[in-house]
């Protein structure tokens, strides 16, 4: 059904809708540029050679530093190879290109340049005394595993400066470039297939470990954190034996390890999806399809509906290849994969609002009752009647709100709870939160604590643009940054502002984060109807 939203209603959330596109799809990019107002930058030595960064706002920035070789040509659909070295001092003052990707929205502005030579890392370092060993926080960006880049998250200055932490953000391959899985690829790489983006992340973690001293970092105190697909990336690393020992702590924001359409697919599922994708590009013959796909220009590789997101179902995600990823993240946690890894797990109170804004409203439609029922039957198939009985359209002001609640509860809130429960069964210490602040108030397009709303509270801005927050919300932002930084330092996120925050064996209590109220609640499972979702094994 067409949607008619007044001009005054559209203008106010426009910046936040762009932010939401970045957080969900990684869609919006701009040409890389050096930092404004930077002085003569510091020089340090890393694997490959010398680099010169920039000093901006009390933070040392080293941008676009290669941690692996180009992924083009014969390196397409292959594990990352070492980056070539260079002579002289390499400028590290501008972001590198993003990995090849599509744009999800018809009105998206020009994206930043893309290249298969995209495996570079941005490192943000606080001023610190010589000899200091700072904790390192490694951010994996979201974007449904089809979009995103490190350049979009270039405003961590307050977190870095005030928290005395290093923040490092690597690029990783996306879509078919990162997650194509075929038997012939597995045969060529010792069983590895469909995990190239995951291996890129691991290559970045090894690079950070090997070069930590160059930035004043502690290679043994590394915290993974990420949002949406970035959160699932953290989960995937928890389930990857090849990543063991590369990190010490983890924060999972709105990207749960349980019951998610982004969860690692089985090889059989991934082989079929990848074969269908290849056939759609004219590379159907099994004997020649790998050479056929490697010969295609990158732009042609993206000429497929699978390379962007049109529904809550996804095609591209890490694969359980039995080498890099050997089990589901939920099972890995229950089996003790995080027994010695402190975890923070969270979701937002109104996650579904973002997906209505980007998948429905931005395309000038709003679901009516028939659309809602049809969508539920397509997504939940045999469980659709149970979902529709629990979320009947008559129980909500509009069908759109019914859909929003289903997405929030089924795709994010309850999976976050199931992640926490699995980790605790495996002996992990876990703190769970629910972000419940509404940066846009009761806006009709992005109401409440929508998916991605917390990220500007962590980074203070995106795309080099500060995200203005009201004073109370900015105070919450500072508190979140203090908590995340303390977690990186100590393995415990509990601060005076976030106390008490139950952990260990307490499976029912969640820290509710709002500008006006920070409380511990025991109603999370009831509010989000997690009894329904507990026996729906896979969503999407």
Predicted regions and their residues:
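Serine-hydrolase-like catalytic core of hydrolytic proteins
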Residues: 101-286, 290, 307, 323-359, ...
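Substrate-gating cap/lid region and adjacent catalytic-acid/histidine neighborhood
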Residues: 258-261, 298-472
């Amino acid at each position: 059904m067409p949607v008619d939203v007044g001009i005054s209603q559209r203008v106010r959330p426009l910046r936040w809708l762009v932010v939401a596109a970045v957080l969900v799809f990684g869609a919006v990019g701009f040409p890389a540029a050096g930092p404004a107002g930077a002085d003569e930058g510091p020089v340090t030595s890393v694997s490959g050679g010398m680099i010169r960064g920039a000093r901006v706002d009390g933070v040392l920035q080293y941008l676009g530093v290669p941690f692996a070789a180009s992924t083009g040509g014969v390196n397409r659909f292959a594990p990352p190879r070492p980056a070539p070295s260079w002579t002289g001092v390499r400028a590290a003052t501008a972001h590198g290109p993003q990995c090849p990707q599509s744009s999800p929205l018809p009105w998206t502005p020009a994206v930043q340049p893309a290249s298969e030579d995209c495996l570079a890392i941005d490192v943000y370092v606080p001023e610190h005394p010589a000899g200091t060993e700072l904790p390192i926080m490694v951010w994996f960006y979201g974007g449904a595993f089809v979009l995103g880049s490190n350049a979009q998250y270039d405003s961590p200055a307050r977190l870095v400066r005030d928290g005395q932490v290093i923040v490092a953000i690597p690029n990783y391959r996306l879509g078919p470039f990162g997650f194509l899985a075929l038997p012939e690829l597995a045969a060529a790489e010792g069983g590895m297939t469909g995990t190239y983006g995951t291996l890129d992340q691991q290559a970045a973690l090894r690079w950070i470990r090997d070069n930590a001293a160059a930035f004043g970092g502690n290679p043994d105190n590394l915290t993974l954190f990420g949002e949406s697909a970035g959160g699932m990336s953290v989960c995937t690393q928890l389930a990857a034996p090849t990543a063991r020992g590369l990190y010490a702590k983890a924060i999972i924001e709105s990207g749960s390890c349980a019951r998610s359409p982004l969860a690692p697919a089985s090889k059989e599922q991934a082989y079929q999806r990848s074969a269908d994708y290849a056939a759609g590009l004219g590379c159907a013959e099994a004997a020649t399809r790998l050479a056929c796909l490697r010969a295609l220009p990158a732009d042609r590789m993206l000429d497929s509906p699978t390379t962007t997101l049109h529904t809550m179902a996804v095609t591209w995600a890490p694969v359980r290849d039995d080498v890099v990823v050997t089990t589901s993240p939920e099972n890995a946690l229950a089996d003790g994969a995080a027994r010695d890894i402190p975890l923070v797990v969270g979701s937002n109170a109104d996650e579904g609002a973002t997906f209505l804004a980007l998948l429905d409203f931005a395309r000038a439609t709003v679901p009516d009752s028939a659309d809602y029922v049809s969508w539920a039957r397509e997504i939940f198939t045999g469980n659709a009647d149970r979902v529709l009985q629990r979320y009947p359209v008559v129980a909500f002001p509009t069908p759109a709100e019914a859909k929003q609640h289903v997405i929030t509860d089924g795709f994010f809130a309850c999976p976050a709870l199931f992640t926490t429960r699995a980790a605790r069964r495996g002996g992990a210490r876990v703190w769970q939160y629910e972000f419940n602040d509404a940066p846009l108030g009761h806006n009709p397009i992005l109401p409440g604590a929508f998916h991605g709303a917390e990220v500007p509270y962590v980074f203070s801005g995106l795309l080099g643009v500060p995200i203005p927050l009201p004073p109370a919300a900015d105070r919450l932002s500072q508190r979140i940054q203090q908590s995340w930084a303390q977690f990186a330092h100590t393995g415990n996120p509990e601060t005076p502002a976030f106390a008490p925050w139950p952990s260990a064996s307490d499976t029912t209590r969640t820290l509710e984060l709002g500008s006006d109220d920070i409380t511990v609640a025991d109603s999370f499972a009831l509010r989000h109807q997690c009894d329904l979702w507990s026996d729906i094994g896979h969503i999407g």
